[in-house]
């Protein structure tokens, strides 16, 4: 009987050890940029994920979910069919609409419908009881919500033609995403994100090219709110 117990314990330990890498090969990444389209291309939307450490590319079966201002799901989550190739630390993953692919000349790693509602909403990587990461904005009202804290630009939302980007300065640096010991994620969207010119990037390392007919410029600032607007000649 003692031998059986030892054997059972060894099997259990082996299963735990083999499961450990699988539990850590996709979730150490964060949402770093969100774009909700512009006046001429309202469906040109995208979300950029970024890996904090190497080896976070096993995305098959994992998903991105979208929510309206009341916290209700919009459509069904978009699901990765498999892993992405580049697993280096700081690698990006692009989830985008076909309109965004065309506008920025970039191939998405996962195609999404235009589910982002600029006035208010939330999106999560791995939505569920314990999402990996979320961002909320505007008049999102399903509060309190520990996954987003205070929405980004509450009452204003995502400015047309502007992207919002995670502030990487919380850990003391400005160019490297940290989400382990030093952390660029405070779980408060108002604190974590700032407006920026759209600059999507995909897992292949390509960056979006802004259409020459689009001019992005800083348009307004009011208190903590600000944004970029778009002029299409």
Where are these regions (language model features)?
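A structural motif detector for short, solvent-exposed N-terminal "entry" segments of globular domains
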Residues: 21-71, 212
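Intrinsically disordered, low-complexity Pro/Gly/Ser/Thr-rich segments with frequent PxxP/GP/PP motifs
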Residues: 77-103
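Extracellular carbohydrate-recognition regions
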Residues: 213-226
